[in-house]
């Protein structure tokens, strides 16, 4: 009997180990912040003051927040105007241009196929795309001609996901490649496959894995999703990510009735906000057009802030949310490991995994990074979109933090916003 009791106690403790704790499968929206969250309700007012001040001063047209700890949403507020000119107030379910937030979705889609055994992370890209170059740029001449040499090592899928491939890494060469790949006989390409096969024929800016440079490699990842799955990127992403997670308002294309929910984008010119309503997330493709064949993989998605919060919570949960598993825990852990050489072009001690920027683990490595707040936990993941939609996933604190506005250029409000969130933690 005594032995049985001891065994029961052991089983009890094993069953309650941190690794086996349940992950929140839905968001909870309490009327007041629970004390168990250890969040100062009074200090959350700093968030409101910051964002309202930026709106009142005309620095940003609007701001939308979504902050949750352990699945409990403790700040989800809308500030400002969806459209300043008409006086239309921002709503929590408005649609935003996500731009490069598309990249993480594409990366996850590709990694679901990795889990299915379709490829190894260090497989050469040329194994699946024979058109892929094996040349590195040596010299680009003023007339557009260039000389090359053979790569020191093959371009791999790991390099694509970590933005260390060298594709489009030279700005002048990237312009040449972009101009060519976006146009065929003076009209845009009809499919992602056509576009990517044109892009990968250009020489690389550096040997794969030797540098970091933000580039259109995510489009290549998107084509590989189509190659391995046998389905259009849009269909596969809906099937494996958007629908399982309940991201019902996220897409590349929409029926016309959704237009009224899309916030107006703004540019800052001479100190004033100027409406640019016809700015689209992607390479000029109207999300309300009839031709929906082309879906860019590095940009192009639109959606609500809660939809993307669902994606972030899935990552935080180790691959599962809404009762559906998208990726395995070990795959998420692999994606969260730095892949870059140091130093690199990303900045002092810049770290990037397989789809996400990573806050360095060592405090000494973080002090020289100007665009990082020192408040954020080491190991956190983040990225965002060109029109200032940002997200952060903090496993240590159990936090997901999102701030959306559709305004360029950057106002640095993201870093200030992060400070106001973290200072409220008790």
Language-model features: locations:
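Short, conserved catalytic-motif segment at the N-terminal edge
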Residues: 35-97, 118, 137-141, 286, ...
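Active-site SXXK
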Residues: 48-51, 71, 96-129, 133-134, ...
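Sec-dependent signal peptide recognition
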Residues: 2-8
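Short, well-ordered beta-strand elements
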Residues: 390-392, 397-407
């Amino acid at each position: 009997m005594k032995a049985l009791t001891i065994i029961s106690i052991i089983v009890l403790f094993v069953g309650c180990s941190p690794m086996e704790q349940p992950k929140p499968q839905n968001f909870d929206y309490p009327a007041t912040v629970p004390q168990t969250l250890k969040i100062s309700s009074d200090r959350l007012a700093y968030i409101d003051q910051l964002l309202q001040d930026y709106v009142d001063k005309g620095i940003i047209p609007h701001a939308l927040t979504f902050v949750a700890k352990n699945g409990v949403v403790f700040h989800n507020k809308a500030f400002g105007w969806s459209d300043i000119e008409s006086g239309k107030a921002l709503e929590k379910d408005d649609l935003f241009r996500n731009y490069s937030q598309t990249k993480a979705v594409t990366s996850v889609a590709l990694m679901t196929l990795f889990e299915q055994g379709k490829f190894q992370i260090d497989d050469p890209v040329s194994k699946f795309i024979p058109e892929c170059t094996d040349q590195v740029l040596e010299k680009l001449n003023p007339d557009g001609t260039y000389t090359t040499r053979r790569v020191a090592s093959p371009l791999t899928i790991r390099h694509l996901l970590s933005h260390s491939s060298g594709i489009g890494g030279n700005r002048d060469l990237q312009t040449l490649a972009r101009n060519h790949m976006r146009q065929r006989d003076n009209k845009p390409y009809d499919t992602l496959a056509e576009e990517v096969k044109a892009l990968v024929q250009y020489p690389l800016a550096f040997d794969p894995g030797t540098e970091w440079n933000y580039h259109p490699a995510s489009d290549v990842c998107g084509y590989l999703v189509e190659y391995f799955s046998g389905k259009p990127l849009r269909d596969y992403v809906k099937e494996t990510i958007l629908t399982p997670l309940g991201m019902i308002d996220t897409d590349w294309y929409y029926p016309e009735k959704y237009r009224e929910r899309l916030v107006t984008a703004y540019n800052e010119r001479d100190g004033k906000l100027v409406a640019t309503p016809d700015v689209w997330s992607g390479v000029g493709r109207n999300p309300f057009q009839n031709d929906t064949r082309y879906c860019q993989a590095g940009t192009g998605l639109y959606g609500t802030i809660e939809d993307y919060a669902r994606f972030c919570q899935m990552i935080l949960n180790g691959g599962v949310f809404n009762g559906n598993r998208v990726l395995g825990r070990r795959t998420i852990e692999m994606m969260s490991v730095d892949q870059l050489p140091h130093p690199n072009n990303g900045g002092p001690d810049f770290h990037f995994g397989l789809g996400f920027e990573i806050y360095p683990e060592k405090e000494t490595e973080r002090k020289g990074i100007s665009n990082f707040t020192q408040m954020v936990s080491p190991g956190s993941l983040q990225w965002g979109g060109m029109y200032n939609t940002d997200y952060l996933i903090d496993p240590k604190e159990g936090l997901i933090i999102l701030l959306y506005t559709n305004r360029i250029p950057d106002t640095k409000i993201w870093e200030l916003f992060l400070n106001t969130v973290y200072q409220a933690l008790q």
